[in-house]
């Protein structure tokens, strides 16, 4: 890949949960409205939470998570809200790419993981291979009902606005973010920005701030050696985060999940072959018992 690698840095410490990024993603990609029954929210948005989408899906490529850390009595002077704008991480070592049997998932020149929906056969191996639960199967919408990205029977996810990036534009979500919590740019520049943000927060006493996706010190960037330390996963994330609590609080793996087996088809074939052998053996044993029983009756 000769082109400059692009990505996004998501600084959760300045996310206000406004959801402008969610709206911008929906509008630019012409995604259909999320089915509230499908995300099992019911009236939760009106009652206990500001989270109105629940999770990422085939029609919801960006989701603002709300982590409400308050005691049971909801004392205003205690606790905090943590918020994170979540999407595909466009992993350097992408499990979805490893297991896709058709090449429907592919790497762009800028480092994003994109999808050829006309090549996708809907096998859903990538869904299980993604350690972040990003990829979803679309079994409801086609392009007439759900917009140009919707091909019924295929998978969908954030594609890092590959059409915009190819034309020299940033991502729609980053452009819409009013606080610069989401920043699009060259990957090295974003790492430098992330290191400066971690340094600034630690200087102010917020030593729980760290980067999820890269080890900035190992990458040669200056950041504090004390306090919370960065975590590099799956070879690095082209969309990476500044977090203020443990990864699992944000619904992320606490450890590097690594790559899935590169080709799961031989294993699947072996399982089918074994099932066939056992089936034939079972039929043969059943027939033998019937013949023995018939002989005894005579």
Could you tell me what each predicted segment is?
Residues 1-298:
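Non-ligating segments of multi-cofactor redox enzymes
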């Amino acid at each position: 890949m000769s082109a400059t690698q692009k990505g996004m840095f998501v600084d959760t410490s300045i996310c206000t949960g406004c959801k402008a990024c969610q709206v911008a993603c929906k509008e630019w990609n012409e995604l259909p409205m999320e089915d509230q029954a499908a995300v099992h929210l019911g009236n939760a948005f009106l009652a206990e939470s500001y989270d109105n989408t629940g999770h990422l899906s085939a029609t919801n490529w960006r989701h603002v998570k709300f982590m409400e850390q308050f005691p049971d009595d909801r004392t205003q002077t205690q606790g905090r809200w943590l918020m994170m704008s979540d999407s595909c991480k466009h992993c350097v070592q992408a499990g979805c790419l490893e297991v896709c049997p058709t090449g429907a998932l592919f790497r762009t020149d800028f480092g994003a993981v994109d999808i050829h929906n006309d090549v996708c056969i809907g096998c859903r191996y990538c869904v299980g291979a993604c350690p972040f639960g990003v990829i979803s199967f679309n079994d409801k919408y086609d392009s007439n009902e759900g917009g140009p990205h919707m091909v019924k029977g295929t998978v969908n996810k954030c594609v890092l606005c590959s059409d915009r990036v190819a034309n020299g534009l940033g991502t729609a979500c980053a452009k819409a973010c009013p606080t610069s919590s989401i920043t699009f740019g060259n990957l090295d520049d974003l790492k430098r920005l992330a290191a400066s943000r971690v340094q600034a927060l630690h200087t102010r006493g917020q030593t729980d701030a760290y980067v999820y996706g890269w080890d900035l010190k190992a990458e040669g960037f200056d950041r504090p050696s004390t306090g919370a330390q960065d975590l590099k996963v799956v070879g690095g994330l082209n969309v990476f985060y500044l977090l203020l609590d443990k990864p699992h609080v944000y619904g992320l793996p606490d450890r590097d999940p690594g790559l899935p087996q590169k080709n799961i088809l031989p294993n699947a074939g072996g399982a089918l072959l074994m099932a066939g052998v056992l089936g034939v053996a079972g039929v043969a044993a059943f027939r033998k018992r019937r013949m023995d029983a018939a002989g005894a009756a005579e």
